[in-house]
Structure formats: structure tokens, C-alpha cells
Amino acid sequence: MLLGVIADDFTGATDIAGFLVENGMRTIQLNGIPTGDFEVAADAVVISLKSRSCPVDEAITDSVAGLKWLQAQGCQQFYFKYCSTFDSTAEGNIGPVTDALLAELGESFTMVCPALPVNGRTVYNGHLFVFGELLCDSGMRYHPVTPMTDSSVVRMMDAQSAGVSGLVNFQTIEQGSDAVTARLNELKAQGSRYAVVDAFNAEHLVTLGQAAKSLKLITGGSGLAAGIAKNWTKHLADQSDAKHAGSPVKAPTVVFSGSCSVMTNQQVALYKQLAPHFAIDVKACLTNDQYANEVFDWVMTHIQSEFAPLVYATAEATALKAIQEEYGAHASSHAVEQFFSQLAIKLQQNGVKNFIVAGGETSGVVTQSLAVKGFHIGPQIAPGVPWVRSVEGDLSLALKSGNFGDENFFAKAQSFFS
């Protein structure tokens, strides 16, 4: 085992796992920390947790437990994966988890690299942009759990962590990996614990990956994974078949959408023109014990459609706000996730093999409900969104973070069926 990744949510885990596979590392994703014997034959293992927005102490406990399991498997380098939009608050969880992992490893310095240029997440002079907009001006400022009202990664990291951040700017990065290494050493000597790095193109990430090869712990989004993988694949004999085990096959398929992001709204709107679709009634989720059974009947009447039936809770910002005000943000969200859980189980029991899911929380709930312990990582549908196939059984899933993929994502995912 070469690389161990601790991801703070399910879609983030498949995101980084997909980039590792695309760059030649045989990768398995585990849903939570294995208990008992679990044999892993891979170059990289990604543990997906649900620690992005849980209480800080819980996030630390779970992340450190994941690290200890990866250490026991002989991993040589570790990566703490969080969202490329740095989803967090002044309380955490990115900073506290980073500090806990450093302490557990006996290290005092790491890199902070949220950038994912291929999906429009770039860092320039320490400020995070989403498709050219400052993070605080993007749709992320309306996020219901972690509204992002700042764009300075240095400032955000320092607000939620025990150490001090320093910046490696793009001018240094464009001088090459030796210049970056020198700057990292300089920051470390100055007492910085975190090196926030600029990155707004793929070349920056390759350079940063080369400079990070001596770090025991790296933190960031999935963008840097390509550079890290390249460090390891130089020493691997066969990289040609890394994604084969995770490829999907044609079988009964359903699309779930629980995300309310701007891109998911666009994806749902386009897909509704192609496929049968069912909008979830939040009040029914809260009050009707048989609602999942009723929607199950609807899905099964459309399961043989040319395009898989869509069941969605996706709503635009104003509609979402109205729902939260009427039913409560937590209560409505929990009820919808429980609905997806019940529906997923019933569909699996009745022969549905492929699940396309939009939204990190929804993906986590569905994956847990289907009792999938781990995945082989397959081909990428879009940057950061691969098909994955269960290690045990014959389920395939496409787990999409809210804003990932283009407008045609749901239909494109189905073009991969063999």
C-alpha cells in the first residue's frame, strides 16, 4: 500500500479516487473504517467518512481512527481530502482534523491545496475562486450548512486551526518544484504549520505534487491527487487496467438528486426533458410513512425507460429557503435523506443495480443504506466523478458532488454501460 486517503464525505472520496485511477493507481474506496479482517489489494485506499459537517470532536475521532487503520496497512503517505470549495466554518472541521492528523503522525507541517482547476476551483494569491468568482461571491455563500462568506484560504485556515498559515504563490510555483520546496522549508523555519498554495492550472498541480512527495501528510481537494499519483506510478509496473474493475454494466438504473446546488438544478432541468421524473414532496416525507413505497411503485413503472427515472428533491435557492422556513432546515433535510434511504433499499431488493446520485449527503445515505463496504473505482464520467462498483456484489454507483459535472451529466453517465 502506497497512499492512504481520508475523505470527509462520500462524493469527495470518489472524486479523489477517480483522479488516482485516471493516473494509474489501482484504488479501492472504503465506506467507513473496516472492522475485522478486510483484505485490500490496491496501490491506494480511500476511506470515506461523514465528517465534513458533524461535531468537531466526532470528525477528529473518526479521522484519526481512519489514519490508524491506514497506518496498519503500511501506507507510506497520507492525504486528508476535503471539498475544493473549502466547506467549513470558523469552528472546523478542516483545521481541527488537520491538526489532529499532524499530531498523530508526529509531524509539524503540511500543504493546503483546495484547488481543482478542471472544475473551476482555483487559488490565486491565496484566494479561492469558483469559475472566476471569489468563493464568497459564488453560490457557496448560500450553502445551508457551511455558507462560505470569505475567500482567503489563509484567513479561513487560521480561523479554525491551532497553527499559522503561509502562502506559496504562483510566481514561486512557476519556477519549478525546487523553488516550491525551498519556499516550504522557509515557511516551516518561520514557524508556519500550513502552506497554502496557489494553483490555477494543471501544470501548477504537477509541480506541487513533485514538491509534496516528501510530506507525510498532504491536505486538499482532489486536484493535487494527479500530481501525487504521478510520484508513485513511476514505481509501478502495470498501470493499464486500473479502472477496469470499477466499470458499470447495463442493468436497471435509477437517478436520485438531493443536491440543491446551482449546477445540479441545471442538470435536473435538462434531464427532465429526457426522462420520467418525480419531485419529492417534503411534507409527505415528514408525515406519510408509506411515501417511499408509493414512489417505489412509480419508479418501477418507469424502470425500463430509455433514460433512467429521476427522483429529486433539488430546488432553487428561494424554494429551498421556503421549505426550510416551513419545516425546519434539519428536519426537512433528515426526512428527505431517510426517504432516499428507504427507497434505495426497496429498489435494490427488486433488482435495481445502478444508482446515479447527486449530492454528498444523499450519496452517503444511499451508500450506507445499500450496505456497500467498498468500491472498485472505474472510469470518470466527469472530472472527479467516476463510476464505482461494489467490492462485494454487483452494484454500480455514480456519486456526484453537487456542483460537479456538466448539464448533461445524468444522461452521459448512462452512456458508460457495457
Regions of interest found by a model, annotated:
Residues 299-358:
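C-terminal structural cap/anchor segments
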Residues 352-353, 361-409:
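Conserved, well-ordered active-site substructure
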Residues 43-51, 305-307, 389-418:
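A structural-propensity feature for long, helix-poor, extended segments
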